[in-house]
Amino acid sequence: MSGGLSHVPVLREEAVAMLAPRADGVYLDGTFGGGGYSASMLEAASCTVWAIDRDPAAIARGAALAARYPDRLHLIEGRFGDLLALLRDRGVTALDGAVFDFGVSSYQLDDPSRGFSFRTDGPLDMRMGAAGPTAADIVNGYAEAELADILFHFGEERASRRIAAAIVRRRAAQPFETTADLAAVIRTVVRPDRSGIDPATRSFQALRIEVNQELAEIERALEAAASLLAPGGRLVAVSFHSLEDRIVKRFMNAATGHVAAPSRHDPSGLARQAAAPRFRALTRGVVTPGEAETVANPRARSARLRGIERLAA
């Protein structure tokens, strides 16, 4: 990993303050990334943190922080959607708090070899971990209708059908291999608008979500973390786009007793929670970054922070 890469945790102070770590507490950092949330929790109280990340590079980077807190920080390579099994395999059956940052790590976005960005050329990969199909596998192998559905549902791309058709035409002549190659084809279909957003933005988001099954993972992670929280335990989540925030909002509304519509990923799981509130809300609406943070870190602009607390049994 290049030494020039860095990751700035978004809403770190607000998220950790909402989590309110206490001495001897056991906490989960479900999206370790650059370790910012874990470090803040460990500094805030003499607590134990279990940190999960599916990216082997993130786990490797975290070794230095783990060495500073040898008995308090424990790193786990895996998907946060599998956190229930990952923690129970290590003897962890209850948590005093859990925090998630559902955005893509800046380490991943800024490393061309990971294939997440259309701003720099790289292999068309987009995997957050080391296994599974790549974005190239999807654009070169999925049927046109399936591609269009992914772009529409996960990217909210209105030109999804035209983009899918252009992808299929181009791959018939030559398979896609790089991010620049795909972005160029998308830009022939979707022209820039006054917003200044690159025409490839929504399609790249959609492919990344499909590659990593992000939305289903988020739902599994929220359910699992909530099930492990002890009374008074807190669940805090930072989301970055409307699809993520919709899932977090629906889940937390259901957990606090508000009626929630079932998700297409989990048609019955979230709705079951509406009958008996198990949590109270920690926020009225959402917490968003202040001007100083968005100026220092433009990627923070779309961040939304929500939290809930487990009620006594």
Curated annotation (Swiss-Prot):
Ligand binding (S-adenosyl-L-methionine): 35-37, 53, 80, 101, 108
GO molecular function: rRNA (cytosine-N4-)-methyltransferase activity
SUPFAM superfamilies listed in its UniProt record: Putative methyltransferase TM0872, insert domain, S-adenosyl-L-methionine-dependent methyltransferases
Enzyme class label: transferase
InterPro entries registered for this protein in UniProt: RsmH (IPR002903), SAM-dep_MeTrfase_MraW_recog (IPR023397), SAM-dependent_MTases_sf (IPR029063)
Superkingdom classification of source: Bacteria
A GO cellular component entry from the record: cytoplasm
Keyword set, alphabetical order: Cytoplasm, Methyltransferase, rRNA processing, S-adenosyl-L-methionine, Transferase
Cellular compartment(s): Cytoplasm
One Pfam family recorded for the sequence: Methyltransf_5
GO BP terms, alphabetized: rRNA base methylation
Its EC number(s): 2.1.1.199
Reactions catalysed according to its record: cytidine(1402) in 16S rRNA + S-adenosyl-L-methionine = N(4)-methylcytidine(1402) in 16S rRNA + S-adenosyl-L-homocysteine + H(+)
Summary of the function given for this chain in its UniProt record: Specifically methylates the N4 position of cytidine in position 1402 (C1402) of 16S rRNA.
Family indicated by similarity: Belongs to the methyltransferase superfamily. RsmH family.
Protein name: Ribosomal RNA small subunit methyltransferase H
Gene from which the chain derives: rsmH
